[in-house]
UniProtKB/Swiss-Prot annotation:
It is found in: Cytoplasm. Keywords: Aminoacyl-tRNA synthetase, ATP-binding, Cytoplasm, Ligase, Nucleotide-binding, Protein biosynthesis. GO terms for biological process: arginyl-tRNA aminoacylation. Its EC number is 6.1.1.19. It comes from Francisella tularensis subsp. holarctica (strain LVS). GO terms for cellular component: cytoplasm. Its main location: cytoplasm. Signal peptide: none annotated. A motif ('HIGH' region) lies at residues 122-132. It comes from the Bacteria. This is Arginine--tRNA ligase. Monomer. InterPro entries: aa-tRNA-synth_I_CS, Arg-tRNA-ligase, Arg-tRNA-synth_N, Arg-tRNA-synth_N_sf, ArgRS_core, DALR_anticod-bd, Rossmann-like_a/b/a_fold, tRNAsynth_Ia_anticodon-bd.
Amino acid sequence: MNIENYLSETLAKVFQKLGYAESFAKVVTSTREDVGHFQCNGAMPLAKFAKKPPLAIAEEIVEHIDAEDIFAKLEVAKPGFINITLAPKFLADTTNRFLNSNKFGVQNNLPNRKVVLDFGGPNVAKPMHVGHIRSALLGDALQRIHRFCGDTVISDVHLGDWGTQMGMLIEEIKLQSPQLVYFDENYTGEYPTESPITVQELAEIYPRASKRCKSDINEMEKARLATFELQQGRRGYVALWQHFVRISIDAVKKDFDSLDVHFDLWLGESDANKFIDEMISYFQANNFIYEDEGAWVIDTNKDGVPPLIVIKKDGGVMYGTTDLATLWQRSKDLDPDEIIYVVDKRQSLHFKQVFSVAERTKVVSEKCKLKHVAFGTVNGKDGRPFKTREGGVMHLADLISQAKEYAKNRMPDENDDSIIDQIAMATIKFGDLINNYANDYFFDLEKFAQHEGKTGPYLLYTVVRAKSILRKIFGDNYDIKSLAKDYKVVNAHNEYEEKLQLQLIQFPIAVQRAYENSQPHHICEYAYSLANSFNKFYVNCPINNLDDESLKKARIALCMATVKAMTIASDLIGISIPERM
């Protein structure tokens, strides 16, 4: 139950009764704790329609509200705010209801939707680096959130395995080892099952090939021709390319496993290749495509968005072509209600073109919503793209090692590597996801590793503290679900209990905001606020030495509720919680 929605519905009945539009009854969390828990600001925009002063409207609404079981206090403030304080019993009862629910008050979306999430997107032959973090962590958080809210999610890594970089690699290896059978057009036998190069060699070859092509237009033309021949099915090139893909996927899977990020599908641009001819024929039959200076293009019919080139002058396909073909494939095979792309904001124009063409040509059905979660860049403390101390791009494995080193330095006596791993992951993930995805941000590992402030380790420390209270009382194998039947939250005895209860019941609000806006930072902010509220409660509300047994049980129930809410919130952003720190 989203408490903001519940209160909005309660006030909407009064608005309707008085002849006002229900849409003005929206309740939001108060921006000032000193005046109330929640507030309704609808009287101000309503005033110009009702032709009454907003203060008079607010007073009229409050006068007609009859819900003493929900509200302890309703106050009107200039110029027309309605400040709401919840009744202590309603606050306690709602906390208990959430504690005893499987998802801490969050209800499944109805009807169930099918969502395809396209994220990760590493390129074949390139090691994963710090720049891949945002897509991987943001996409993983979104798939966790969507599943939690009841959607059927199909996640696809969508490998970059079909572009000009493949031709660059082929030409570079041909230059290096021309005797390989992959380059003999007359060869008719079976190609070797073992790759002629390792993934480490592949990672070294690509920068060399890229540099050569950028400095020599003739080399770039060779790479483009090799790419075209690969896409046309030249046997030797296809066999060599298959080695590139296989050894790259093995390495990439290890990197994603280290982040606890997993995918349902491991498809690439190449998997859509077989649909391109069928799709082009469809475009031609319906007069969507036309020739322009030797290339084949489709208009977007959107102001400021240029036409999309589908077939190049040389007959090769573009990145946009394979993206359209991927949408064609997903529509036919999966029939989703929504497809979400978690990709760098520098690709925004590209996705505007692709989405516009896909919708105009009905490559996707009318029910299917297309969304680009366009994230900002990861910068170092100097404000520039994040680099190693030597100035190079930091590989993901090196970043994780650094995070583990920071964790170990802060806990030198900790010998359990699994705990160090959990702290390192919390450091990286929370440090990234606490930021609104649309913004660039500074990746400061030293700051993220602190055990105080808005960090992953602080989050873990708080939950471990709450769990240790329960473990001291119930032993190691306690079960919150069964214990909650006998331990109930009661009306708050002081401000610390009240604020903790208030924070606990806002969990569904954070989840709904994260879900609707594709913004996991709402869950991070919630978890941080809950951690602060619990730590103040912990300091000011003793448990173990209490003589009042009913109060003791009520505070234990608040510890249970905190552990449950924090555990779910942490899982939604891909963070696992150790038993101790």
